[in-house]
Amino acid sequence: MTSSRAVVSLFDIEKGVNDTMSISQQTGELVSYETGAAAILRSQGLPASDDYALTSSPLRFDDGGHYRIEISGVERLSTLEALLDESAKRNVHVHRIVAFGGGATLLDRGELTAFADLARESKIQVIAVPGPRTGWDTGRQALSSEGTTAGRRVRGVDNMRFLIDDYLRIFECGFRGVLVWDEGILNVLNTARTAGDIPEDAVFKVSVYTGYANPAGIKLLEGLGADSVNPVGDLGRPMLAAIRSSVQIPLDVWAMTFESFGGMNRLWEAGDIARVAAPVYFKVEPGESEGVMYNAWIEPEFHEKLVRHKVRHSAILNELVTSTQKSVGVSPTPTRVS
């Protein structure tokens, strides 16, 4: 009788995995010949292990692309202008930007509207960051050394209202994409989108600060209305492949991370990450720390210089994907964005 499982060695999989385990030829799962937990996970449509077979994702963006480029920290109009100039020089299209890391509240309506108009003309989707909110209100837990582990949840109803008004101001200035880091707020926004209380084409990107790192959690966010999710930045390819097997929405994966958040550089892995986790937004965000990069008083020239580095690194990512995974393609420049 031929077994449906192919036994593999420790070297073949990952350090520390017991050699009595095996990889399923059908699913790529690593399992210990059934456990109660494995049965429970499968019964709920979840994988029973990370995908050590690194199964290719069957999903793509609607234009056929495996991945798109996302650059964070586009703080004001002059930063966007520098990004566009460098993109033209390096022949790389930036599909999406995360804007106003220091908080959209700190830009006036004229600045916000001009930014939205230029991004739309340039076929770039914007994810606008509201605030500053959590960590800048009167609550101190979120800033304490151990309180940071609780995440950036919104404290109380007043802060919920302030935040939602911030989102409404962003929508009124012409943006459609927003960053969300509280599951309750995500549910409120999704309900409002369904009810027509906010634009029906609003886009919700769930922040890495929610701390999700497995298929069950990201499937939950998808059900709450997330349009893409940024899982924690240090997930291996088997973990990302397992997440992809459970959800349909794009994953936002850091290709370069700022130093205070780990400083990971995954440029050489990008092609294979896109192969197993497509559709993927590759986030390019080198730098020192949020505290240095995203505050309201830093000089505009700092961001203009830094964003040029981010575009250069994005061009290198495209080059390395092409050289390492010839079957993986980047999305073309879109004809329009919301």
Predicted region positions:
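Active-site pocket-lining/capping segments in soluble small-molecule metabolic enzymes
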Residues: 7-175, 180-212, 230, 237-338
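Short, glycine/polar-rich helix-capping loops at beta-to-alpha or helix-loop-helix junctions
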Residues: 213-217
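Hydrophobic, aromatic-enriched interface-forming segments
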Residues: 224-227
